[in-house]
Amino acid sequence: MSAATDQILEQLKSLSLLEASELVKQIEEAFGVSAAAPVGGMVMAAAAAAPAEAAEEKTEFDVILEEVPADKKIAVLKVVRTITGLGLKEAKELVESTPKAIKEATGKDDAEAIKKQIEEAGGKAAVK
């Protein structure tokens, strides 16, 4: 790879989920393409690969914010901002649009710690 592509790749790795989503939308608009998964053959290939993956031990987990009681929204919002590094507006949108992934592809211990922080703040989270 060239130095330019390496640099772009490193910048992409540092994006938050919200920033990555915004980037995808901008690319779709700029180039007139769609990031939607093709239907048909890919679905069949994914279904065939699923049993083989099930045999392997899962090492990456997603933390999903499932529910936030109205009286606990501020406390959960603070925890979400700490975990994700999002700004106030982005974190508020994430908290208000549950269920939503807060952290993806993280280790089991980290995922459990994040879930515990959210639950201590009054929210409901799941590790998947």
Swiss-Prot record:
GO terms for cellular component: cytosolic large ribosomal subunit. Pfam families: Ribosomal_L12, Ribosomal_L12_N. GO terms for biological process: translation. The keyword S-adenosyl-L-methionine does not apply. Transmembrane segments: none annotated. Keywords: Ribonucleoprotein, Ribosomal protein. GO terms for molecular function: mRNA binding; structural constituent of ribosome. Forms part of the ribosomal stalk which helps the ribosome interact with GTP-bound translation factors. Is thus essential for accurate translation. HAMAP family: Ribosomal_bL12. NCBIfam families: L12 (TIGR00855). Homodimer. Part of the ribosomal stalk of the 50S ribosomal subunit. Forms a multimeric L10(L12)X complex, where L10 forms an elongated spine to which 2 to 4 L12 dimers bind in a sequential fashion. Binds GTP-bound translation factors. Belongs to the bacterial ribosomal protein bL12 family. This is Large ribosomal subunit protein bL12. It comes from Synechocystis sp. (strain ATCC 27184 / PCC 6803 / Kazusa). The gene is rplL.
